[in-house]
Amino acid sequence: MHRRFTANDAEEDGTTQTSPDSTAPEGTVFHHANDGRPLATPWQVATERSIALADRPLAEGYIVDPACGSGLQVWAHALTLARPAIGIELDPARALASALNLRTVGEMSGGVGLPWCEGSAVLAGNGLEAEQALTTALGQASPCVAMLQLDPARPRNSRHHDLSEMRPALDGVLDAWRPWFAPHDLGPAMLLDLSPRLSADQRAQVEAMVEERWPSLRRTWVWTSRGRGRVDRLALWTGPLADDGALRRFVRIPPKMGERPFTVATHHPVEPLTITVHPPQRGEHVSLLDAALVESGLVAQWLADVTKDTDLRWGVVDGRRPQLHHPHPLRLRPEDRGLVQATGRVVALFQGSLSDDTVQDVVELAIEHRFSSLKLRLATPPERQPAWQGALDRQLNGRSGEREGFLAQHPNGHTLLLCVDAVSNP
């Protein structure tokens, strides 16, 4: 059985918590259950993804999210696309939070009373019981799903996990909702918001599940990043949601509200990057690039727009700090700068790794090379990073140096690179 909530009848019962979202309009407070806040999609990310769907030719019908959590993504879709939506959540407290958030989104947008808000509902119950859910929400079940949004729960604090650990299971969701899609010439519209840590093999498994049920269905993988060296979202968009012919798309969400995202897409298969480790060299340039851009496979296409260098050498392609070595500075446009964590010219080499014993030696080398600021751009023990960065800041600040820069780790693992920042010191 499912319990039905709407924006009009949801009442706080003490099982939810509230918290502001800095990416939402000022004063907006969203509801979460228990530890739901860290799992919730930021409102800015949710709305930007919904805006990207605005020109997609969906069938008539409802947006359905069978594992909606706090509901921010499905209500962003409903608001932006002006369509009613049905969110389903197994946990009753999260279902209530989602209904309260439906009301919040309606109130902050002036949507209360409009068809998309009045026609939307939250069901507390099993998202795999599709027929029963539609009957509870609408009075009867029929093929009325214009779009399926899915963001299944995954193991937390785990760098790698199997597809079978997602809840609800992806194959179960596809089978449960397969009969209920509204007819469309391009097939079912699905936004499968999966783990950002999916490997290439796991992505192939997901595609095989979709292909088995809907042969030749159009699909596009979309990587989304807000920077900070991480992939925030990885999703498969299918049917009318997929880009026409585009196999992959990368979206960089800007740090400032109101700015438009930066997008790169390709219609062609991508080649894997090859690591080439050369001895460290003074005078060469080092760039730490957006991890999601590199993981998406679209970095070569982007690099063709910002450099004419042909001698590009990848030192690191995985993790939070993909590292590229090149002879000349990148020619960055304003919109490109969000894709670069740091870029600059190597002016000094330090043989060894950063530690409590060597940080003072690094400070002295930085002073010798006229640095006024040197930011750590390498993996460090979390408990030591503040002390090491603090030592650099205290001793370089107020000196006669005029260079701003960063400290990176050469891929050989035993050389530190002191780099003059190319953006601050053009």
Regions found by a protein language model. Name each.
Residues 1-426:
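SAM-dependent transferase fold signal centered on methyltransferase-like domains
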